[in-house]
Amino acid sequence: MKKKVLAMLLAFAMTFSLAACGSSGGDKKQASSDATEESGTDEDAIPENEITGDPSAKDAFVIWAWNTDFTTLQDLLVKKYPDLKDRLVFVNCGGSSYYQDKIDALLEDPGNELYPDMMLLEVGYVQKYVQSDYLMSLKDLGITDADTADQFSYNIELGSDKDGVQKASFWQATPGCIQIRADLAEKYLGTTDQAELEKMFSNWDSILEAARKVNDASGGKVKLFSGYDDLKYIFLNGARTVGWYDDNDVIQMDPAMEEYMEYSKTLYDEDLTFNTTMWGTDWAALKDGDGEKSEACIAFAGCPWYTYWSLTDTWDKNTILVDAPVQFYWGDTGLAATAKCADKDVAAEIIKSCTCDKDFMTSIYKANGDFVNNQKAISDIVANSVKGASTFSLYGDQNIPEFFSTRGQNVDVSLVTAEDMTINETLFPAAVTAYATGKSDMDTAIKDFKAAVHDTYSYLKVE
């Protein structure tokens, strides 16, 4: 097991920077790859760490992250525990593309003054660290099952190792949805009624029918979805029935993933999307198009943080949330204390406050709008109409926390592995694009995909 973990860490070090590049949507619709190039960063320009606090102080407690989101929580913590004000050292590594490489080196160097006592973890790679010896269990910190009882169960599973020992604890929950622009839905789908839209988006056949209807009615100026890439998390984080490899470490292809490849090809061949890649400039521009003078799309896959912070003003009071054909999740950020954490008591205070304490987690929602990983807190937020940091609101009488409050109970993460981030973000999308755009047939695309997975993770086998 130790050899496998070391091999996995090496594979991540070599491939993680590729994940930021993603895969483009194809040839005739080349805008997605162009947007990636425009929005990409120079991989050689590794940013300096931004450090707040004094890491050389004898009682310094060092927390690592890839952005500044945690500073809102840190401000709340300092109010609750004033003694932490001069002790906490916050390190922002400068971006998620650099986080793992930087922190992996420090995890092997506990004598370094920047060694993390606590580290933030994204859901995409949390299992990489949870399955290693680099993290301390919550029970070692004195945090019990009773403390985490109100967390969504899928987040507990994501933060636990193969033996069910929880090492990471999430303050966010991110069940997925489909976000529909009401004005365009009324014009091209003929309704803004949530129940009717739920039916349209309840299965992939009816979604395809709606996509054709929108495309024909708008003369191609409006599409239902921006690109097949926009559907990937629904399939990857909701539709799978088998993992990327079996108990014998043999790489396998889930039938649901083949279905996604076929679905993507249909969308591409029939020109039913703009073939954009998520986060590209062309993808972003479609949110504000009017469908006449400028191109637009009606729906985006989403989740709480996306709804609050990634939709534009065009969508404010103009967004209807519905379920996808399968329940999925997208994101989550959590906390973990490292094995050589300098102060277990401080680590316990932070993790219990940020991920277990109903009242404190409600204050997080008020401060930054996060849909928190505490079912009692969410129930109180809904019942008492608690105002969060975001002023974004939905169409009609829909309520964001209320909509998502029950969706997190149905998320299945039993197939998540430590390798998922690289496979899901880089290797599999390349296979989807190769097949959808006609560069490879299905058998070749799958064969090349399996070979790429093996090349990245040599301990995974192709048969």
Give the label of every model feature segment.
Residues 40-51, 121-177, 319-323, 390-395:
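Hinge/lid segment of periplasmic solute-binding proteins
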Residues 75, 96-137, 149-168, 205-218, ...:
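Pocket-flanking alpha-helical
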Residues 6-7, 21-127, 346, 440-463:
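Conserved N-terminal structural module of periplasmic/extracytoplasmic solute-binding proteins
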Residues 98-101, 239-324:
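Extracytoplasmic ligand-binding clamshell segments of periplasmic binding protein
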Residues 392-455:
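C-terminal capping/gating helix-and-loop segments adjacent to ligand/active sites or protein-protein/ligand interfaces
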Residues 139-146, 157-231, 244-278, 339-345, ...:
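Helix-loop-helix "hinge/cap" segment bordering the ligand-binding cleft or interdomain interface
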Residues 108, 312-377, 430:
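Extracytoplasmic/periplasmic substrate-recognition and gating elements
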